[in-house]
UniProtKB/Swiss-Prot annotation:
GO terms for biological process: lipoprotein localization to outer membrane; lipoprotein transport. The keyword Isomerase does not apply. This is Outer-membrane lipoprotein carrier protein. InterPro entries: LolA/LolB/LppX, OM_lipoprot_carrier_LolA-like, OM_lipoprot_carrier_LolA_Pbac. Its main location: periplasm. It is found in: Periplasm. Residues 1-17 form the signal peptide. Monomer. HAMAP family: LolA (MF_00240). Participates in the translocation of lipoproteins from the inner membrane to the outer membrane. Only forms a complex with a lipoprotein if the residue after the N-terminal Cys is not an aspartate (The Asp acts as a targeting signal to indicate that the lipoprotein should stay in the inner membrane). One of its GO terms (cellular component) is outer membrane-bounded periplasmic space. Belongs to the LolA family. The keyword RNA-binding does not apply.
């Protein structure tokens, strides 16, 4: 009888775990990772608008480096306080605070451990896919779908814009490890315009 009661308690806790709690638990499985990705941007009708590739490094909490190599190179780096967006083609770097970035894109949620970050979102789960949607009063209008296994392995994510345009990112390699701290520093190259929005 005792075993049955314990089993029921365990099943109840599993059944009633919130999708947000489950996603947070999975994200907390590893402290960092490195991955290569492919990107495909689709129109609302499903036509391929763009394809690209790059690599990402995340060190939780708050550190990430997102490097898109093709079709147009750009780099997004944060040291946990400042986020730099560098576009070599236009020779410009934009700086903003990490909290500002969190309110503009749910991707930053992958890197943080701050419970209040989730206040602007609702989370739904379908297997290993978690749909992170902005609440009605949020300034964010895009939906974010992260695909993450119970082990914490992120296999990819998608961003669905309000107009139906979709960007799919699939991780072609994934290595759970702590990237070197030096990956999360950025030095503004000479001759580059600076747009400081902090």
């Amino acid at each position: 009888m005792k075993k049955i009661l314990l089993s029921l308690c365990f099943l109840s806790s599993v059944a009633f775990a919130s999708p947000q709690g489950e996603l947070t638990d999975r994200l907390n499985q590893n402290k960092g990772f490195e991955a290569s990705f492919t990107q495909k941007v689709l129109s609302p009708e499903g036509d391929v608008l763009m394809q690209g590739e790059g690599d990402v490094k995340i060190l939780r909490p708050n550190l990430f480096r997102w490097h898109t190599q093709t079709p147009d190179e750009n780099l997004l780096v944060t040291d946990g306080k400042t986020l730099w967006y560098y576009n070599p083609f236009v020779e410009q770097v934009t700086l903003m605070g990490l909290d500002q970035a969190t309110t503009q894109t749910p991707f930053v949620l992958l890197t943080r451990n701050k419970a209040s970050d989730w206040d602007n979102y609702s989370v739904a789960q379908n297997g290993d896919a978690f749909t992170v949607s902005p609440k009605s009063d949020s300034a964010i209008k895009s939906e974010f779908i992260v695909r993450i296994q119970p082990s914490g392995k992120v296999t990819g994510f998608s961003v669905v814009e309000q107009d139906g345009q979709r960007s799919d990112f699939n991780f072609t390699t994934f290595e759970a490890k702590k990237p070197a701290q030096s990956n999360f520093m950025f030095t503004v190259p000479d001759g580059v315009d600076i747009d400081d929005q902090r």
